[in-house]
Amino acid sequence: MIELGKFTVAQRAMTIAGFAPAMLVGCAVHQSPSSAGYVPVPEYAVRMPVPTPVPTPTPVPPPPPEAPAGLLSTITALESQFDGIVGIAVTSVDDGWSVAANGERRMPQQSVSKLWVAMTVLDYRDQGRLTLDDPYTVTKADLTVFHQPVATLIGENGYPTTIRELLRRALTNSDNTCNDILLRYVGGPDSVRDFIARKQLGAIRFGPGERLLQAGTAGLEWRQEYSIGRAFYQARAALPSAVRLSAFNNYIADPPDGATATAIAQALAQLKRGELLSADSTSWLIATMESSHTGRQRLRGAVPAGWSFGHKTGTGQDFSGRTAGYNDVGILTAPNGKSYTIAVLIGDTSRTIPQRQELMQAVVASVVANHH
């Protein structure tokens, strides 16, 4: 046995501390858990503090650059000084700013609405529901009214063509019959309206198709015989002036194909950014718009050398010196690659055609002057 008396106080404490575990182990070995005085060894859980998660703040995108003040003042003056109802809008595709004058009023689109038909067709193509090489034979039963140059190509067995060619004619020549064929091919007006809604294009309406739209604007009920020759013009001329005036005014006041200049400019910006269609369909549509043969003295008349411009025009019916819709919308791209979308919609005016074109060209000139 160790004699503790020979140890210092510190040594005694260390020795006892060393024996203590062995003594406890001995007790555990020789004493049954059922013995009197048994104290169970508690189980200790180690609890680590859990830090409170700190939420990561959502980054706030910087506001878009301000639009050029000179551009805003110019289009505001152009709109206010023009004799008629006009809406003007310009959007920067790259910088995101927009300017407008009377840009929230719905104006008659007329053939500008062919853009939404074309986009719907190309959206169907992107989904694999059709191809641009799908065949179609145009017959006299397909004819509509007004501008339809494809009518001269229809023979005894019709005119065999493709969806691609119908699209090209509808966009570059504004052929009404080709456009109405495409409209029916994708399921009618509701399919185009669905595309506009799915893509959230805003204040853009799509009308009932060329035949019903033009008949309603004139005050007529559509008949297919109106598609031949000048039958539509003759039927319209036979109407009482009061009937024509009422129908004309009703159309301008609440056009079933009405759209705002702001919505159109922003939709074209989405198209250019590739947000509406596949890359291939986007490129095809913009290239086709750039090869348009219509409206050379509208917006295009002020496009400088070295800039590119793809567009779609729209022209409504005349009555008593007034025109219900004289429009041009498009995508203007500078030599450095920056793009702007422009929409000029003249909903009702008695100004001469050169005066209307001068207004449109002044808008383009201001965009170019404020480009940097």
Question: What do these predicted regions represent?
Answer:
Residues 2-5, 28-76, 184, 189, ...:
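Structured C-terminal helix/loop/strand segments within mature extracytoplasmic catalytic/sensor domains
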Residues 3-16:
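Bacterial N-terminal signal peptides that target proteins for export
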Residues 18-22:
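Hydrophobic membrane-insertion alpha-helices, especially the h-region
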Residues 24-26:
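C-terminal motif of bacterial Sec signal peptides marking the signal peptidase cleavage site
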Residues 30-221:
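Active-site-adjacent loops and short helices of periplasmic peptidoglycan-processing enzymes
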Residues 159, 220-228, 309-316:
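Carbohydrate-binding/catalytic loop surfaces
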Residues 171-174, 243-247, 337:
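Short, flexible turn/loop "capping" segments at secondary-structure junctions
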Residues 204-280:
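Active-site-proximal helix/loop microenvironment
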